[in-house]
Amino acid sequence: LARRISCSPSLISQIERGLSAPSVGILYAIATELRASLDFLFGATAVGDAMLATAHGDGHLRPENGAAHTARSGWPDGHGLVQRAGRRATIDLASGVRWERLTPGADERVDFLEVIYEPSGHSTDARRPLRHDGQEYGLIISGRLQASVGFETFELEPGDSIAFDSSVPHQYWNTTGADVHAVWVVVHAHPGRA
């Protein structure tokens, strides 16, 4: 795997053991190579209509108490239809970016995320453009985010949105001293793969 995605075996091992956080680029490369969805990499298992795992503030997912419940038989917080803010599955990336899944269950067709860029946060740790299948849509909620798509660079401000074919090389970065909060949707051309 490491050779196929151009990273070191030790990095893969550290990611597997929770000792290192991947960049967005490495995360997408792993998902693509494994032909897995990002939901799979979030680490939760789909049961019925809902994911029975939640983030616990340390960047790791653990099964919910009473994991035998499904969305239709007593799943808390909206019966599998509502994702409560404090119970989102999260991934903290090495490059100062945090992804919080906004859906209460797995959907291999789409990634619906709140993305938080810390000051100096960047979509890839190597600061190289990323590309993957699908269409990408973003809306800036707060802060200012630099976006590069193809050969164009944009500064996105609160209320601005962006949409493009995500097979075009792209990257994002925060050059300000404040967090950037954005809502991001990636619709996959080949469901089940990132």
Question: Which residue stretches match the model-derived regions?
Answer:
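Short alpha-helical DNA-recognition segment
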Residues: 1-13
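DNA major-groove recognition helix of helix-turn-helix/homeodomain DNA-binding modules
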Residues: 25-40, 46
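Short, charged recognition helix plus adjacent turn
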Residues: 43-95
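A short glycine-rich, His/Asp/Glu-containing loop-to-beta-strand
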Residues: 80, 85-127, 184-186
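Ligand-binding loop in jelly-roll beta-barrel domains
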Residues: 97-98, 108, 157-158, 166-192
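Short acidic-glycine-tyrosine-enriched beta hairpin
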Residues: 102, 150-167
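Histidine-centered metal-chelating micro-motifs
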Residues: 123, 145-146, 162, 167-171
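A short beta-strand-loop-beta hairpin characteristic of the jelly-roll/cupin
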Residues: 125-158
